[in-house]
UniProtKB/Swiss-Prot annotation:
Required for the post-translational delivery of tail-anchored (TA) proteins to the endoplasmic reticulum. Acts as a membrane receptor for soluble GET3, which recognizes and selectively binds the transmembrane domain of TA proteins in the cytosol. The keyword Phosphoprotein does not apply. This is Protein GET1. Residues 73-94 form a coiled coil. PANTHER family: GUIDED ENTRY OF TAIL-ANCHORED PROTEINS FACTOR 1, TAIL-ANCHORED PROTEIN INSERTION RECEPTOR WRB. Residues 182-202 are annotated as: Disordered. It comes from Cryptococcus neoformans var. neoformans serotype D (strain JEC21 / ATCC MYA-565).
Length: 215
């Protein structure tokens, strides 16, 4: 029989991993893998069209519309067709990305939040494990068994909340350990240095005044 406590813990762990890494990062990684398998031909066509359009633009810029009108018109038609094909390919890739994002978000929600809700509701009356008799006061025992598990046991909902709290605490501890310590910076002296810098200027002004008096 599958251990229900372990299943709930793994679902909670998966949810926390998604929160730590970031949904957008996971979605980008998944779409890159999906594109490499299913959209490699379209992506290669996009790169080829983009390269061709750039070459046609450069050649069109070097061609005079007055001196070489026939060649210029031919290049212009070729460039317009290339731009139209490139836009069509870009729209195809954009549509595929949008569709993939919706499906991936739905799948991710079902695997994390949806699975947690389903497990908590489906096994709401089943105790995950029992507490020793008299180990906690009655209000705490009732809270741990909420909503429908027997008093004295830990319900699936309470167990999921405990797992989330423990994982969040571990995350905070790891982040505090990995965080760089702020560098010790001493106070910047301003008064004495400015006073020292002002002394030569004061001496120069006094000497100038004495010379003016002598003159």
């Amino acid at each position: 029989m599958i251990n229900l406590a372990l299943v709930i813990f793994l679902c909670t762990l998966l949810n926390q991993i998604v929160s730590w890494v970031g949904k957008s990062v996971l979605q980008e990684i998944a779409f890159t893998a999906y594109s490499w398998v299913f959209l490699s031909g379209t992506a290669a066509k996009q790169r080829k069209l983009r390269k061709q359009v750039l070459e046609d633009k450069a050649e069109l810029g070097r061609t005079s519309s007055q001196d070489e009108f026939a060649k210029w018109a031919k290049l212009r038609r070729k460039l317009d067709k290339g731009l139209a094909d490139l836009e069509k390919t870009n729209n195809t890739l954009s549509s595929s990305r949008s569709s993939f994002s919706k499906k991936f978000s739905t799948l991710l929600w079902l695997m994390t939040t949806g699975a947690q809700f389903l497990l908590s509701w489906w096994f709401r009356k089943q105790p995950i494990f029992w507490l020793p008799e008299g180990w906690v006061p009655y209000p705490v025992a009732w809270l741990l068994s909420f909503p429908s598990a027997p008093i004295g046991s830990v319900s699936s909902g309470a167990w999921g909340a405990i797992c989330r709290r423990v994982l969040s605490t571990l995350q905070e501890i790891i982040q505090s350990l990995l965080a760089p310590s702020p560098a010790a910076t001493g106070p910047v002296p301003t008064g004495p240095s400015s006073a020292k810098n002002d002394q030569p200027e004061a001496k120069i002004e006094a000497l100038a005044l004495e010379h003016e008096k002598l003159d």
